């Protein structure tokens, strides 16, 4: 009788490891366009700088590749069964950071933040309590785009103070919430946010929009401690001498 070959975990490594970080897939997330799978954190961070799949190089989505991501819960369960102790290790790490991260940052009582995290439904996870004040900053002009005769023009007005400064990690979704709050819009009311006439996805960060959509380039980032004619090479808080202009309007349903 032929003996069955015993399979080792390393035999399955090509199927359960992330192409980006080379570790075991954590919250495996699949790109629906090409069906390549990566760690959720790895692929979300990759899409902040690129619209292409890191493995095959194909464009995932022209403007918002995060819409093409799906969590693979079945693969996650398979990995937990193949790799002894992985589930328990992740649970211990999660508990550790829940207990220690707020105390380390001194932010036990702070409210929700603007850090983008895609969950199973694609909404933003706002459990993190860091305001990102130490992040590079960007200046933005929020301009009301008025279309004559468009439904909703009477509801959406221009802001009294339309210039803001925020973290480069702020997402379009957070900007929409800010506008809804300032304009006192109903919770069901939806807005479009545009840059150079192109509608931006809710998970786009300000840094991503600046680098890929705004016509001005990195030379307009200035250090707060330098003169307007200097470009500072130091790391630290930055601002844009010519604010990036984002326009907003009532959402248009093209369906």
UniProtKB/Swiss-Prot annotation:
Main location class: nucleus
Stretches for region Disordered: 97-132
SS bonds (residue pairs): none
GO BP annotation list: random inactivation of X chromosome; regulation of transcription by RNA polymerase II
Domain of life of the native organism: Eukaryota
One GO cellular component term noted in the UniProt record for this chain: nucleoplasm
Compositionally biased residues, Basic and acidic residues: 109-119
Coiled coil: none
Subunit structure: Component of a PRC1-like complex that contains PCGF5, RNF2 and UBE2D3. Interacts with RNF2; the interaction is direct. Interacts with CBX6, CBX7 and CBX8. Interacts with AUTS2; the interaction is direct. Identified in a complex that contains AUTS2, PCGF5, CSNK2B and RNF2.
Protein name, per record: Polycomb group RING finger protein 5
Species in which this protein is naturally found: Bos taurus
